[in-house]
UniProtKB/Swiss-Prot annotation:
It comes from Alkaliphilus metalliredigens (strain QYMF). The gene is hisG. It catalyses: 1-(5-phospho-beta-D-ribosyl)-ATP + diphosphate = 5-phospho-alpha-D-ribose 1-diphosphate + ATP. It is an enzyme of class 2 (transferase). It is found in: Cytoplasm. PROSITE patterns: ATP_P_PHORIBOSYLTR. Heteromultimer composed of HisG and HisZ subunits. PANTHER family: ATP PHOSPHORIBOSYLTRANSFERASE (PTHR21403:SF8), ATP PHOSPHORIBOSYLTRANSFERASE ATP-PRTASE (PTHR21403). This is ATP phosphoribosyltransferase. The keyword Amino-acid biosynthesis applies. It comes from the Bacteria. The keyword Amino-acid biosynthesis applies.
Length: 209
């Protein structure tokens, strides 16, 4: 039987991804005791799990370094890779939103400056609305940008909204709801079809899809 290689995003989705695999009967003991290992074999289930940073999951899948991956829809929208997105896994739910200072009197304003970790998503959103904006790419806490005058608004993931409120910010507009997704390499789906299809069906049954 072919071994299926699956990439899991480090960070907020990792624990829930492992729980999903456990819920369909996969022995995830080696994942729980992996220490600093980045590649963990699950020989009983003919799986190999690779832990990578979330933005890298689409790249690993697209180039066939792994057969499939679990990653947030936010990453997929930003990366825009050629992948099969086969399942909404129904966890890691949050929203992409436009937010700014509670003291901002008018939204939107002409030629806004937009701070974000997701420049492609922000650009596409405002272009679709015919709004001219300047995108300012950031890596750190984007909430800081409106507070110090770097940007008028931010585009970011919002879960509870607590961080925004604590920093005097509010949501002006929601862009899209996001959640964890299962994505496949197109070639792998053909060459390992039976094994991958079986795994997809087990996950789909558990997630109700």
């Amino acid at each position: 039987m072919n071994v299926i290689k699956i990439a899991l995003a480090k960070g907020r989705l990792a624990d829930q991804s492992v729980k999903l695999l456990e819920s369909i009967g996969i022995d995830c003991g080696p994942l729980l005791d992996k220490g600093r290992k980045l590649i963990v074999a699950l020989p009983k289930d003919h799986l190999e799990v690779v832990f990578v940073k979330a933005p890298d999951v689409p790249t690993y899948v697209e180039h066939g370094a792994v057969d499939m991956g679990i990653v947030g829809k936010d990453v997929l929208l930003e990366a825009n890779k050629q992948l099969y997105e086969v399942l909404d896994l129904q966890f890691g739910k949050c929203k992409f939103s436009v937010a700014g200072s509670t003291s901002m009197e008018n939204y939107p304003t002409p030629h806004m400056r937009v701070a974000t970790k997701y420049p492609n998503i922000a650009k596409n959103f405002f272009q679709s609305k015919g709004q001219s904006v300047e995108i300012i790419k950031q890596e750190g806490s984007v909430e800081l940008a409106p507070m110090v005058g770097l940007a008028d608004v931010i585009v970011d993931i919002v879960e509870t909204g607590n961080t925004l409120r604590e920093n005097g910010l509010m949501v002006f507009e929601d862009i899209v709801e996001i959640s964890a997704r299962l994505v496949l390499n197109q070639v792998s789906y053909k060459t390992k079809h039976q094994e991958i299809r079986g795994l997809i069906d087990r996950i789909a049954e558990k997630t109700g899809k």
